[in-house]
Amino acid sequence: MLDERKLEVLRAIVEDFVSTNEPVGSKALVERHHLKVSPATVRNDMAALEDEGYIVQPHTSAGRVPTKKGYRLFVDRLSTIKPLSVAERRAIEHFLAGAVDLDDVISRTVRLLAQLTRQVAVVQYPTLDRSAVRHLELIRLSGTRVLLVVITDTGRVEQRQIDLPGELEETDTAELRNRLNAAIAGKRVVDVPDLLATFADGEPPARRSAATAIVSAVLDALVIRRDERVVVGGAANLARFPTDFPESVQPVLEALEEQVVLIRLLGEATRPSEVLVRIGEEDVHEGLRSTAVVSSAYGSKGRALASLGVVGPMRMDYPTTMAAVAAVARYVGRILAEN
């Protein structure tokens, strides 16, 4: 167990190395961070940190740099996440508030996260299995054709044109719309199949076949597909860190092209109020083992809808990045809840 002074030395080493990308020496630490101890004492502390695997000496004439273990302890000992400035929070709110639909929200979120953190931003679309039906609309296009529109509470819109087996009057269309909304509006998408299992059986014979066709279209519109969408932005930011990856950024870029990998990376963030940090994990895609991932779920009323985060080198400004991810996740959840 490290004492508080050694933790302070480790924090200073991480902060300086993240800022300068240069090995950190004891004299520079004392001067820059006002540690109130001699360089010799700091050297002893650095030797202890090195013995325990928190820092390493890249070559004999150099200072020290943090290891994966050192970054991990640094993050775990952050007592609070550094808050964003009032101006930054207003900019986030203003930028996201201009979104016109779910696709625009996701697109803006990716761009915003990449700009705020100067890392690669990854945003998952809200998954249907975490969504609820907000409203259903039936629009009569002709006597034998209707347009079905289903809107979820996450802003997702699904449309289907339905060819009916027979004529359906305007009054019957309105009645079916009202009854369907009464049955499933406000209900979770995963519960809809059970809720509509006997819906058509309760309809008058004259519109039972139309009801069956419409229910089938509703179920098709709300089927939970596992090809969940993930959007990536800011990949060019990796070019800022040419020395932070063992060989090149190419393996990282290749990993970022695999949706399954990204969903797995973000999937562990399940609570909107929580920020998770993965550093050089071994159980991920090989191309991401030299990276760090900062992620959080977004949602409303404590219910997670999906996740977002950033991918970058282990030499990352963790306090600022964690604050940005937390703030953006909070605003995205709020906007989806309001709209």
UniProtKB/Swiss-Prot annotation:
InterPro entries: GAF-like_dom_sf, HrcA, HrcA_C, WH-like_DNA-bd_sf, WH_DNA-bd_sf, WHTH_transcript_rep_HrcA_IDD. Keywords: Repressor, Stress response, Transcription, Transcription regulation. One of its GO terms (biological process) is negative regulation of DNA-templated transcription. GO terms for molecular function: DNA binding. The keyword Protein biosynthesis does not apply. It comes from the Bacteria. Disulfide bonds: none annotated. Pfam families: HrcA. Belongs to the HrcA family. Negative regulator of class I heat shock genes (grpE-dnaK-dnaJ and groELS operons). Prevents heat-shock induction of these operons. This is Heat-inducible transcription repressor HrcA.
